[in-house]
């Protein structure tokens, strides 16, 4: 309908232009792919993040329903690889989770500890992303993490598992998207503290 005027309200790239963080929406998967550390979530910038995420394993109580045998309860068992949302890339995907855990936290001692550590890692990573997006308010006007739930029991980016259990990420997301956010950012040995508000009236605060 060339005679009808259309004005996009979200950041818009325009027809035929290449992907750019300066206009339009943006998908950020460099961390999940294993090519960047989780702190990269703080360094990227875009007008609108429409996809970004990080994986974790299922809760043990959910996992034992499809991996009841002890031999199945290994990160690289056939069952665990079948229940990895990246499919053909499952070995690498699970390996990346383990590598990021070892890069950021004490080594888990048990299989259960590894599952839990993956939840902490996922929550910490996405918290970095959300807070960075919100600190950049005015340039960045959208932040949609991937993903809310699962359609089957699987290791994935979801914040709620197939059984309906909230992972640590879901609690963090709820807090990180509150209408007021106090967020610290360290760079070049400097600590910057931001007060971000989505309320309609200006607000002041005192940092104690």
Briefly describe each language-model feature range.
Residues 1-12, 16-17, 143:
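Active-site mouth of glycoside hydrolases
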Residues 20, 30-205:
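Substrate-binding clefts and catalytic carboxylate motifs of secreted carbohydrate-active enzymes
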């Amino acid at each position: 309908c060339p005679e009808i005027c259309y004005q996009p309200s979200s950041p818009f790239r325009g027809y035929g232009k290449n992907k750019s963080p300066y206009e339009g929406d943006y998908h950020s998967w460099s961390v999940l792919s294993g090519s960047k550390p989780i702190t990269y979530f703080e360094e990227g910038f875009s007008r609108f993040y429409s996809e970004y995420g990080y994986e974790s394993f299922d809760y043990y109580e959910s996992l034992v329903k499809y991996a009841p045998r002890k031999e199945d309860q290994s990160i690289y068992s056939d069952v665990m690889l079948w229940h990895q949302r990246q499919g053909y890339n499952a070995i690498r995907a699970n390996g990346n989770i383990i590598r990021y855990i070892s890069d950021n936290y004490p080594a888990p001692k048990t299989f259960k500890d590894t599952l839990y550590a993956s939840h902490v890692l996922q929550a910490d990573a996405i918290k970095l992303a959300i807070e960075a997006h919100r600190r950049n308010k005015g340039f960045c006007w959208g932040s949609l993490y991937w993903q809310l739930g699962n359609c089957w029991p699987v290791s994935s980016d979801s914040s709620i598992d197939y059984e309906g259990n909230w992972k640590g990420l879901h609690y963090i997301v709820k807090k990180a998207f509150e209408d007021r956010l106090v967020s610290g950012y360290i760079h070049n040995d400097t600590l910057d503290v931001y007060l971000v508000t989505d309320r309609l009236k200006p607000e002041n605060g005192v940092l104690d």
